[in-house]
Amino acid sequence: MSAGGPCPAAAGGGPGGASCSVGAPGGVSMFRWLEVLEKEFDKAFVDVDLLLGEIDPDQADITYEGRQKMTSLSSCFAQLCHKAQSVSQINHKLEAQLVDLKSELTETQAEKVVLEKEVHDQLLQLHSIQLQLHAKTGQSADSGTIKAKLSGPSVEELERELEANKKEKMKEAQLEAEVKLLRKENEALRRHIAVLQAEVYGARLAAKYLDKELAGRVQQIQLLGRDMKGPAHDKLWNQLEAEIHLHRHKTVIRACRGRNDLKRPMQAPPGHDQDSLKKSQGVGPIRKVLLLKEDHEGLGISITGGKEHGVPILISEIHPGQPADRCGGLHVGDAILAVNGVNLRDTKHKEAVTILSQQRGEIEFEVVYVAPEVDSDDENVEYEDESGHRYRLYLDELEGGGNPGASCKDTSGEIKVLQGFNKKAVTDTHENGDLGTASETPLDDGASKLDDLHTLYHKKSY
């Protein structure tokens, strides 16, 4: 038994891990340090487990008790990682608030000094004008004469009036400051609620996938217990494996669709109606899309997945106004099987980014569409709160930015829905290397049968 299971879940699946991308730069180094510490713990955990395995079988009680204690240590370490991330997040939040308060205090002190100087200058100008006025009227006036003209009660009334005006202005200023502070807190709380909603949506996706993953693995275990060998066993095993990876594929696509604009509903490719997709487990026919890309343009798409994540190279986002959006032949959820004859089925993520960024001129994509809504009990249900807002995995106002029209580069680390059950997080990378006009040519539907699904999905268990 290894500590690799609970630790990554605590290090990446908790509230701290989910919001580390919006933290201060110091938080990034802290999480890197925590990741190194976690790897060292896993290594030591495995070494101790191997040592316990070398104990004589006659002393199995010692081995069992030792592994129970190691399980407790692993659980404690996972909780410690989670608490450390939470404390780090709170610390960075307090540091940011402290910086803001210091800045506001400095501005307030500076304004106070400036106002005092202005009042002093205004008083000097007032006295100067009064002396000039008396000189023009032929009256000799000094400070004593001016004071003598003012009776006692009038001076007191003037002071009371000034004090009353000061109190009224102070009340108005305090109310304005409180309103400003409350608006600032409201904005921060709304952002925090949006992050929590994203975590809930991601957790529901992960739980949904884990449920189907567990069902598939149970069927495989049952298959191992049956007396079945030869081609029939291999065919059934590959069929179960293909279903598991198909559900993983659909989960990633739902995560990708969660970040798209709600005002632009996702459209399936032409000819992909619900009835035909249901017959093929939601997998459409293989299509070829021809594009023309100028040298100064990017593809205008974002990709995710790869061999290391157990899913094919997927189109996770199509940027509006970019060549991929203008051509209309590519869709979110398409798995890129090949580009210009280069097979991408067994390609890792970075390799796919490199291959796509090197394409110039006329580009031929070989893609297959997978509909996440098909063959599922509640895929068509929108996750909405009481106000009617759908839970979205990504919110534009929470993302730090990133120009979708920039040149091709890999900004991995966006999708973390599957991080709780896979130590390698599915990384959504922006691949912006671009396309021009396109035409779409449907091909044979031979790859859409369930028996052949394992040719589209990697048989990688974790």
Swiss-Prot record:
Coiled-coil boundaries: 83-200
PANTHER family the UniProt entry points to: GOLGI-ASSOCIATED PDZ AND COILED-COIL MOTIF-CONTAINING, GOLGI-ASSOCIATED PDZ AND COILED-COIL MOTIF-CONTAINING PROTEIN
Keywords: Acetylation, Cell projection, Chromosomal rearrangement, Coiled coil, Cytoplasm, Golgi apparatus, Membrane, Protein transport, Synapse, Transport
Name the UniProt record assigns to this protein: Golgi-associated PDZ and coiled-coil motif-containing protein
Clinical condition linked: A chromosomal aberration involving GOPC is found in a glioblastoma multiforme sample. An intra-chromosomal deletion del(6)(q21q21) is responsible for the formation of GOPC-ROS1 chimeric protein which has a constitutive receptor tyrosine kinase activity.
Name of the gene this protein is made from: GOPC
SUPFAM superfamilies (UniProt xref): PDZ domain-like
Annotated positions for site Breakpoint for translocation to form GOPC-ROS1 fusion protein: 419-420
Reported tissue expression: Ubiquitously expressed.
Record's function text: Plays a role in intracellular protein trafficking and degradation. May regulate CFTR chloride currents and acid-induced ASIC3 currents by modulating cell surface expression of both channels. May also regulate the intracellular trafficking of the ADR1B receptor. May play a role in autophagy. Together with MARCHF2 mediates the ubiquitination and lysosomal degradation of CFTR. Overexpression results in CFTR intracellular retention and lysosomaldegradation in the lysosomes.
GO biological process, one term: negative regulation of protein localization to cell surface
Keyword Coiled coil attributed: yes
A GO-annotated cellular component: Golgi membrane
Bilayer topology term: Peripheral membrane protein
Location of the protein in the cell: Cytoplasm; Golgi apparatus membrane; Golgi apparatus, trans-Golgi network membrane; Synapse
Domain characteristics, as noted in the entry: The PDZ domain mediates interactions with FZD5, FZD8, ASIC3, GRID2, CLCN3. Also mediates interaction with CFTR and ADRB1. The coiled-coil region probably mediates association to membranes, targeting to the Golgi, and interactions with GOLGA3, and STX6. May also mediate interaction with RHOQ.
Annotated positions of the N-acetylserine modification: 2
CDD domains: bZIP (cd14686), PDZ_GOPC-like (cd06800)
Keyword Coiled coil attributed: yes
